[in-house]
Amino acid sequence: MALPAARSALSARAFIRPAAALNAAASSSRYLSTTTPRHDAPVATTPGNSETALPVPLPGIKFLSMPPVTPHPPTHGIHVATLHLQAHHPYNLDLVSQFAVHSAHSLNIPTSLPAFLPREKSLYTVLKSPFVKKKAQENFERRTHKRAIKVYDADREAIDLWLRYLRQNALPGVGMKAYIHEWVELGFGRKEAEGQNEIEMEVEEKRIQDAAAELVKALSEGEGEDQAEGVQKIVDAAREEKPAEKLKEEEAKSS
């Protein structure tokens, strides 16, 4: 009667051993999940555009943005300035672009919405270790994002005030460059050229008068070889456009 009991004990022991082995395998394996339930982590709320997302998604993060605004329409369509923005992080670039459009809207300056310019890529190859080995190299890519805002029908003083306000409240890491167009009346270049020609003629006439006065003085005072040398110096000075006072100083130093 002892044999059935022994068989039942052996069968029970054989049934328990695989479970123990399974538990040992589960405890030693790092790829199997534990039996405790896990709650799903909240998904980060990122904007629809992939360019404006942060490089590292964080749970529950709130992106700083401004309310949408419609720029003032141009009254005459005269292009007076263009603001170029560029940065390596598109989120900061979009924030500064929105800030520029809002500030121009507050100053009643007609502008366009920020235009997306072509993205610039730069590839850099550096050593992966401090040792000079050809195989131990690493490549890095740097992207530069760019935006452009056009300004219309605004006074120069208003544009200077707007640019100064943007410079005072600039965001680190975002570069700004403005191209300002000045409109003048027709014939402005001709007037500038005429004024320049008049100044040159006055200077040339004065130089000739000084050279003639020095020549007359040398002819009246000098004799022989000294007279010829004095005349030659005055002629050379006139050719080199040297004033009479400078010529006198050189003569005093030589004597």
Swiss-Prot record:
Residues 1-32 form a transit peptide. Disulfide bonds: none annotated. One of its GO terms (cellular component) is mitochondrion. Its main location: mitochondrion. It is found in: Mitochondrion. It comes from the Eukaryota. Residues 30-52, 220-255 are annotated as: Disordered. GO terms for biological process: translation. The keyword Transmembrane helix does not apply. Residues 236-255 have a biased composition (Basic and acidic residues). GO terms for molecular function: structural constituent of ribosome. Keywords: Mitochondrion, Ribonucleoprotein, Ribosomal protein, Transit peptide. The keyword Mitochondrion applies. Belongs to the universal ribosomal protein uS10 family. Involved in mitochondrial genome encoded proteins translation. Involved in the binding of tRNA to the ribosomes. Part of the mitochondrial small ribosomal subunit. This is Small ribosomal subunit protein uS10m. The gene is RSM10.
